[in-house]
């Protein structure tokens, strides 16, 4: 069975462009993988805390020495890592805030980059044999030829992090210019339609 893991980050529900991109992707993916299984991790519905001192203490303590409190501290991180390792295809659906990923996605990343689980002690990624698709909605346009292409920190960051943990096969579907929907210069449906060929190709 082929498994898809979808990580959602937008707080905007049905008004979210990245979530609408996800809907199109999942529909195409399910059509191509009739026996596939989809798991959705909605970061807006996950009590994901930023890393603090108790988490770090648990992280740097050998597992056989973990107290019940330490185990509880890492429980959600363990769950998120398990979801990632179980999937064949990872989808990260995200918006862009000030040129980079939102805080919730950064918190998810900090929870899944784990030495001995997703990253070897030699620095080599352990999440191999998988592919990833990034569905990104941004107000600005950062694709090839854009005068502000160098501001595309979000794409560079996600490619870097995914590569570090071992996922080299990364496709980015860039929904640049998404502010046109909020400014009512275009409709959500028309905007998503322009991205549909890229979404279909990524889901194949």
UniProtKB/Swiss-Prot annotation:
Keywords: Flavoprotein, FMN, NAD, Oxidoreductase. Its cofactor is FMN. It comes from the Bacteria. Binds 1 FMN per subunit. Coiled coil: none annotated. It catalyses: 2 a quinone + NADH + H(+) = 2 a 1,4-benzosemiquinone + NAD(+); N,N-dimethyl-1,4-phenylenediamine + anthranilate + 2 NAD(+) = 2-(4-dimethylaminophenyl)diazenylbenzoate + 2 NADH + 2 H(+). InterPro entries: Flavodoxin_fold, Flavoprotein-like_sf, FMN-dep_NADH:Q_OxRdtase_AzoR1, NADH:quinone_OxRdtase_FMN_depd. One of its GO terms (molecular function) is oxidoreductase activity, acting on NAD(P)H, quinone or similar compound as acceptor. Its EC number is 1.6.5.-, 1.7.1.17. FMN binds at residues 10, 16-18. Homodimer. Quinone reductase that provides resistance to thiol-specific stress caused by electrophilic quinones. Also exhibits azoreductase activity. Catalyzes the reductive cleavage of the azo bond in aromatic azo compounds to the corresponding amines. Belongs to the azoreductase type 1 family. This is FMN-dependent NADH:quinone oxidoreductase. It comes from Granulibacter bethesdensis (strain ATCC BAA-1260 / CGDNIH1).
